Amino acid sequence: MASFLVLAFSLAFVSQTTANYFYSSPPPPVKHYSPPPVYKSPPPPVKHYSPPPVYKSPPPPVKHYSPPPVYKSPPPPVKYYSPPPVYKSPPPPVYKSPPPPVKHYSPPPVYKSPPPPVKHYSPPPVYKSPPPPVKHYSPPPVYKSPPPPVKHYSPPPVYKSPPPPVKYYSPPPVYKSPPPPVKHYSPPPVYKSPPPPVKYYSPPPVYKSPPPPVKHYSPPPVYKSPPPPVKYYSPPPVYKSPPPPVHYSPPPVVYHSPPPPVHYSPPPVVYHSPPPPVHYSPPPVVYHSPPPPVHYSPPPVVYHSPPPPVHYSPPPVVYHSPPPPKKHYEYKSPPPPVHYSPPTVYHSPPPPVHHYSPPHQPYLYKSPPPPHY
């Protein structure tokens, strides 16, 4: 009833809206039927049979016999006799008077005048102009282009299929060799020599173009399939039951009574009376009177008059007239350089030689023969 009222109200509202605005209502949504999901119970778990574990008791421990320890008493200490120390008095000091000082005689100094200086004659220097430089003519270098590289013909590699594997007890896997690599042709490099530089009046360096690289022939790799695995026969394991445990009875315990203690009586203590002290009377002190002082009278002072001064007259000055002047050197300018430049000759490199190489043929892959069972 409620749904009918809702439907009637919606129809009236739609008719009013269509009458006023001429709008159409959207169609009702289409609900597709979907069947209810089917739930399946999981399968019951499969319980595998496992045999009960077998417990083995450990073997009994083996107790080894150890004899009782033997105790030994330590030996008595040994006391050594040490005699009493002997004290000696130090000897009396001996006093000596110091010897009188000795004064040495030193003669008066002698003064000497220095010798006059000696002046050596040195001639005037002579200047020479350097010679003009000599330049030699050197022809320009001739550059040659390197020869083109020579490429040798190499036949295409031949691949052989591997031999069929031999099967032992089980079909072995089939190994296929990889296809051969494809080598693309690359033209040989062309080396061009640089143009010669123009240098005036200097020997130009000689440039040599590097030789072309030599390409060595390397044969193509040969791929071999690995040999089939060899399965060796292994016999089934043999299980041996463990031997029955052997119970060794421990040996009877023998108790040895300890040896009776030995009481060593200490040796009797012998007391030695110390020797009577010896009193050494010190020797009588003998006082020696110091010797009487000796007064050395100094030698009489002798005054020597200094030697009369010697006046050396300087040598007479000798005036040498200067040498006559030399003729002035006239510097001659070098001749003007002759700039000779030969015409530059450029050699074009020779055309490259293209050797014939056969067209690339597709590799025909051969499948290995079927295995023999």
UniProtKB/Swiss-Prot annotation:
The keyword Secreted applies. It is found in: Secreted, Primary cell wall. Residues 329-332, 363-366 are annotated as: Isodityrosine cross-linking. Residues 241-312 are annotated as: 5 X 8 AA repeats of S-P-P-P-P-V-H-Y. One of its GO terms (biological process) is plant-type cell wall organization. Residues 25-233 are annotated as: 13 X 9 AA repeats of S-P-P-P-P-V-K-[HY]-Y. Belongs to the extensin family. Structural component which strengthens the primary cell wall. This is Extensin-1. It comes from Arabidopsis thaliana (Mouse-ear cress). The lineage of its organism: Eukaryota, Viridiplantae, Streptophyta, Embryophyta, Tracheophyta.
